[in-house]
Swiss-Prot record:
Organism encoding this protein: Cyanidium caldarium
GO annotation terms (biological process): photosynthesis; respiratory electron transport chain
Subunit and interaction comment: The 4 large subunits of the cytochrome b6-f complex are cytochrome b6, subunit IV (17 kDa polypeptide, PetD), cytochrome f and the Rieske protein, while the 4 small subunits are PetG, PetL, PetM and PetN. The complex functions as a dimer.
Function as written in the Swiss-Prot or TrEMBL entry: Component of the cytochrome b6-f complex, which mediates electron transfer between photosystem II (PSII) and photosystem I (PSI), cyclic electron flow around PSI, and state transitions.
Family: Belongs to the cytochrome b family. PetB subfamily.
Keywords: Chloroplast, Electron transport, Heme, Iron, Membrane, Metal-binding, Photosynthesis, Plastid, Thylakoid, Transmembrane, Transmembrane helix, Transport
Binding annotation for heme b 2: 86, 187
The protein's required cofactors: heme b; heme c
Gene that encodes it: petB
Protein name (record): Cytochrome b6
Length: 215
Protein backbone atom coordinates (compact mmCIF):
# COMPACT_ATOMS: atom_id res chain seq x y z
CA UNK A 1 0.00 0.00 0.00
CA UNK A 2 2.87 2.36 0.82
CA UNK A 3 4.51 1.83 -2.58
CA UNK A 4 1.18 2.43 -4.30
CA UNK A 5 0.69 5.68 -2.38
CA UNK A 6 4.30 6.78 -2.95
CA UNK A 7 3.90 6.26 -6.71
CA UNK A 8 0.99 8.71 -6.85
CA UNK A 9 2.60 11.06 -4.33
CA UNK A 10 5.72 11.34 -6.46
CA UNK A 11 3.72 12.30 -9.55
CA UNK A 12 0.71 14.22 -8.23
CA UNK A 13 1.75 15.37 -4.74
CA UNK A 14 -1.60 14.20 -3.42
CA UNK A 15 -0.52 14.80 0.17
CA UNK A 16 -0.65 18.55 -0.47
CA UNK A 17 -4.25 18.20 -1.59
CA UNK A 18 -5.13 16.10 1.46
CA UNK A 19 -3.41 18.58 3.79
CA UNK A 20 -5.26 21.51 2.21
CA UNK A 21 -8.62 19.80 2.65
CA UNK A 22 -8.02 18.66 6.21
CA UNK A 23 -6.51 21.98 7.32
CA UNK A 24 -9.41 24.13 6.09
CA UNK A 25 -10.72 26.30 8.93
CA UNK A 26 -14.29 25.60 10.04
CA UNK A 27 -15.91 28.47 12.00
CA UNK A 28 -17.09 27.51 15.51
CA UNK A 29 -20.64 28.76 14.84
CA UNK A 30 -21.24 26.09 12.16
CA UNK A 31 -23.96 23.64 13.22
CA UNK A 32 -26.32 21.05 11.76
CA UNK A 33 -28.25 23.72 9.83
CA UNK A 34 -25.18 24.24 7.67
CA UNK A 35 -25.50 20.67 6.35
CA UNK A 36 -28.49 21.33 4.09
CA UNK A 37 -26.28 22.22 1.12
CA UNK A 38 -24.30 19.00 1.44
CA UNK A 39 -27.52 17.01 1.81
CA UNK A 40 -28.84 18.61 -1.38
CA UNK A 41 -25.65 17.52 -3.15
CA UNK A 42 -26.04 13.99 -1.78
CA UNK A 43 -29.57 13.80 -3.17
CA UNK A 44 -28.28 15.06 -6.52
CA UNK A 45 -25.66 12.30 -6.63
CA UNK A 46 -28.35 9.72 -5.86
CA UNK A 47 -30.37 11.22 -8.71
CA UNK A 48 -27.44 10.86 -11.09
CA UNK A 49 -26.78 7.24 -10.13
CA UNK A 50 -30.39 6.04 -10.18
CA UNK A 51 -31.26 8.08 -13.26
CA UNK A 52 -28.29 6.64 -15.14
CA UNK A 53 -29.39 3.13 -14.17
CA UNK A 54 -32.89 3.72 -15.52
CA UNK A 55 -31.66 4.98 -18.89
CA UNK A 56 -30.77 1.37 -19.73
CA UNK A 57 -34.45 0.42 -19.67
CA UNK A 58 -36.49 3.58 -20.20
CA UNK A 59 -37.77 4.18 -23.74
CA UNK A 60 -38.47 7.88 -24.50
CA UNK A 61 -41.35 7.35 -26.91
CA UNK A 62 -45.00 8.22 -26.42
CA UNK A 63 -45.95 4.61 -27.15
CA UNK A 64 -43.40 2.81 -24.97
CA UNK A 65 -42.54 5.26 -22.16
CA UNK A 66 -45.23 4.14 -19.72
CA UNK A 67 -44.77 0.43 -20.46
CA UNK A 68 -41.01 0.78 -19.99
CA UNK A 69 -41.63 2.31 -16.55
CA UNK A 70 -43.89 -0.63 -15.71
CA UNK A 71 -41.14 -2.97 -16.90
CA UNK A 72 -38.62 -1.26 -14.63
CA UNK A 73 -40.97 -1.50 -11.66
CA UNK A 74 -42.05 -5.13 -12.14
CA UNK A 75 -39.46 -7.00 -14.23
CA UNK A 76 -36.02 -5.43 -13.73
CA UNK A 77 -34.10 -6.68 -10.70
CA UNK A 78 -34.38 -4.02 -7.98
CA UNK A 79 -35.91 -1.71 -10.59
CA UNK A 80 -38.68 -0.76 -8.18
CA UNK A 81 -36.07 0.25 -5.61
CA UNK A 82 -34.00 2.26 -8.10
CA UNK A 83 -37.01 4.21 -9.38
CA UNK A 84 -38.36 4.72 -5.86
CA UNK A 85 -34.99 6.06 -4.71
CA UNK A 86 -35.02 8.38 -7.73
CA UNK A 87 -38.45 9.73 -6.79
CA UNK A 88 -37.78 9.99 -3.06
CA UNK A 89 -34.41 11.66 -3.49
CA UNK A 90 -35.96 14.11 -5.97
CA UNK A 91 -38.49 15.23 -3.38
CA UNK A 92 -35.83 15.30 -0.67
CA UNK A 93 -33.50 17.32 -2.90
CA UNK A 94 -36.13 20.03 -3.36
CA UNK A 95 -36.82 20.12 0.39
CA UNK A 96 -33.12 20.30 1.31
CA UNK A 97 -32.56 23.00 -1.31
CA UNK A 98 -35.37 25.14 0.13
CA UNK A 99 -34.00 24.74 3.67
CA UNK A 100 -30.50 25.56 2.41
CA UNK A 101 -31.74 28.75 0.73
CA UNK A 102 -33.54 29.82 3.91
CA UNK A 103 -30.45 29.13 6.02
CA UNK A 104 -28.19 31.12 3.69
CA UNK A 105 -30.66 34.01 3.55
CA UNK A 106 -31.27 34.15 7.30
CA UNK A 107 -27.53 34.07 8.08
CA UNK A 108 -26.68 36.69 5.46
CA UNK A 109 -24.64 34.35 3.28
CA UNK A 110 -25.66 36.27 0.16
CA UNK A 111 -23.96 39.52 1.20
CA UNK A 112 -20.63 40.91 0.01
CA UNK A 113 -18.27 39.30 -0.95
CA UNK A 114 -20.43 36.22 -1.61
CA UNK A 115 -22.86 37.65 -4.17
CA UNK A 116 -21.63 35.36 -6.95
CA UNK A 117 -21.98 32.32 -4.71
CA UNK A 118 -25.60 33.34 -4.10
CA UNK A 119 -26.21 33.87 -7.83
CA UNK A 120 -24.87 30.43 -8.74
CA UNK A 121 -27.03 29.00 -5.97
CA UNK A 122 -30.14 30.65 -7.40
CA UNK A 123 -29.28 29.27 -10.84
CA UNK A 124 -28.92 25.81 -9.29
CA UNK A 125 -32.33 26.24 -7.67
CA UNK A 126 -33.87 27.03 -11.07
CA UNK A 127 -32.15 23.98 -12.55
CA UNK A 128 -33.51 21.82 -9.72
CA UNK A 129 -37.08 22.95 -10.42
CA UNK A 130 -36.46 22.31 -14.13
CA UNK A 131 -35.40 18.76 -13.28
CA UNK A 132 -38.72 18.27 -11.53
CA UNK A 133 -40.77 19.71 -14.39
CA UNK A 134 -39.07 17.63 -17.08
CA UNK A 135 -38.83 14.43 -15.07
CA UNK A 136 -42.48 14.53 -14.00
CA UNK A 137 -43.61 14.05 -17.61
CA UNK A 138 -41.25 11.24 -18.60
CA UNK A 139 -43.55 8.35 -17.53
CA UNK A 140 -46.01 9.81 -20.07
CA UNK A 141 -49.06 8.74 -18.12
CA UNK A 142 -52.14 10.92 -17.78
CA UNK A 143 -50.59 12.99 -15.00
CA UNK A 144 -47.33 13.44 -16.89
CA UNK A 145 -49.03 14.28 -20.18
CA UNK A 146 -51.32 16.95 -18.77
CA UNK A 147 -48.57 18.38 -16.57
CA UNK A 148 -46.43 18.72 -19.69
CA UNK A 149 -49.27 20.33 -21.61
CA UNK A 150 -49.97 22.86 -18.85
CA UNK A 151 -46.33 23.75 -18.18
CA UNK A 152 -45.44 24.21 -21.84
CA UNK A 153 -48.55 26.31 -22.32
CA UNK A 154 -47.62 28.85 -19.65
CA UNK A 155 -45.29 30.94 -21.89
CA UNK A 156 -48.21 31.51 -24.26
CA UNK A 157 -49.17 34.48 -22.08
CA UNK A 158 -45.91 36.28 -22.95
CA UNK A 159 -46.61 39.11 -25.40
CA UNK A 160 -45.29 38.83 -28.97
CA UNK A 161 -42.98 35.81 -28.51
CA UNK A 162 -45.24 33.60 -26.38
CA UNK A 163 -46.50 31.38 -29.18
CA UNK A 164 -42.98 30.88 -30.52
CA UNK A 165 -41.67 29.88 -27.09
CA UNK A 166 -44.47 27.34 -26.70
CA UNK A 167 -43.72 25.87 -30.11
CA UNK A 168 -40.02 25.57 -29.26
CA UNK A 169 -40.79 23.81 -25.97
CA UNK A 170 -43.29 21.43 -27.54
CA UNK A 171 -41.50 20.87 -30.81
CA UNK A 172 -44.69 21.79 -32.62
CA UNK A 173 -48.15 23.20 -32.02
CA UNK A 174 -49.23 20.29 -29.83
CA UNK A 175 -47.76 18.02 -27.16
CA UNK A 176 -46.39 14.78 -28.59
CA UNK A 177 -43.27 12.77 -29.37
CA UNK A 178 -41.16 15.85 -30.08
CA UNK A 179 -42.10 17.26 -26.66
CA UNK A 180 -41.17 14.05 -24.86
CA UNK A 181 -37.86 13.90 -26.73
CA UNK A 182 -37.07 17.48 -25.72
CA UNK A 183 -37.94 16.86 -22.08
CA UNK A 184 -35.89 13.64 -22.01
CA UNK A 185 -32.87 15.38 -23.54
CA UNK A 186 -33.16 18.26 -21.09
CA UNK A 187 -33.59 15.93 -18.13
CA UNK A 188 -30.74 13.54 -18.92
CA UNK A 189 -28.17 15.66 -20.76
CA UNK A 190 -28.59 19.43 -20.74
CA UNK A 191 -29.71 20.01 -17.14
CA UNK A 192 -27.18 17.59 -15.54
CA UNK A 193 -24.32 19.17 -17.50
CA UNK A 194 -25.33 22.68 -16.46
CA UNK A 195 -25.80 21.54 -12.86
CA UNK A 196 -22.30 20.06 -12.68
CA UNK A 197 -20.79 23.26 -14.11
CA UNK A 198 -22.57 25.54 -11.66
CA UNK A 199 -21.97 23.15 -8.74
CA UNK A 200 -18.23 23.28 -9.40
CA UNK A 201 -18.35 27.08 -9.56
CA UNK A 202 -20.47 27.17 -6.39
CA UNK A 203 -18.10 24.93 -4.42
CA UNK A 204 -14.95 26.63 -5.66
CA UNK A 205 -16.26 29.99 -4.47
CA UNK A 206 -17.26 28.53 -1.11
CA UNK A 207 -13.82 26.98 -0.85
CA UNK A 208 -12.15 30.29 -1.68
CA UNK A 209 -14.29 32.57 0.50
CA UNK A 210 -15.16 30.19 3.31
CA UNK A 211 -18.41 29.95 5.25
CA UNK A 212 -20.10 33.21 6.17
CA UNK A 213 -19.99 34.32 9.78
CA UNK A 214 -22.91 34.39 12.23
CA UNK A 215 -25.41 37.25 12.34
Amino acid sequence: MSKFYDWFQERLEIQLIADDISAKYVPPHVNVFYCFGGMTLTCFLVQLATGFAMTFYYKPTTIEAFSSIQHIMTQVSFGWLIRSLHRWSASMMVLMMILHIFRVYLTGGFKKPRELTWITGVILAVLTVSFGVTGYSLPWDQVGYWACKIVTGVPEAIPVVGDNVVEILRGGTGVGQATLTRFYSLHTLFLPALSVIFLLAHFLMIRKQGISGPL
